[in-house]
Amino acid sequence: KQLPPFDGDAVEVDGYGADEAKETLLDYLIPRLTPACVERLTHQHRMCAGIGGLISRCFYFGTLENKRPDSERPEWLRKKFSKPVVWIDTPNSPQQRRIHTYTNAGEQDVVLAQLKTIQYCASRAQQKASVAVIAGYAAQADALNSRIQRDSFASLSIEVATVDSFQGKEADICIFSVTLSNSADFLGFL
């Protein structure tokens, strides 16, 4: 099973209809291959169990097993963040709409505070860590990158990216900036 492509704007292009635009490469190949050439992958090693479990339940009906133990997380990080996944609510930080995108200054403040905490912990432990700061909106990623560049994070190698541009990469620590926070329960395209 493969995660479906984002097809919110699927249109007919070059003679292909919307249904064909939604078809994944695996959807196309599997019926055309002999059974001996098809194998379902049931184990994942990249994500921590908290994130891997969420992905397994939401997309793979609980069939994807996590093989990366949470004990692999560095001790200096476990001391400050006892759980591998932390959600921080920012209900009083509404997003600001830009042309076709969004930013959220209050959430940027929270991300910077978390980075400073991680930098402090890594520095005290004399360790280095790679950190991905990921946002669903390009304007938020740009604003975060600009603010991060103004600070010093000597123990951290930080990459700021959108969800799409970070796909397939990995980091020791990931911070996801949801960006949208509103009382209308507007989810945006995420």
What are these regions (language model features)?
Residues K1-L190:
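Conserved helicase motor core of SF1/SF2 NTP-dependent helicases
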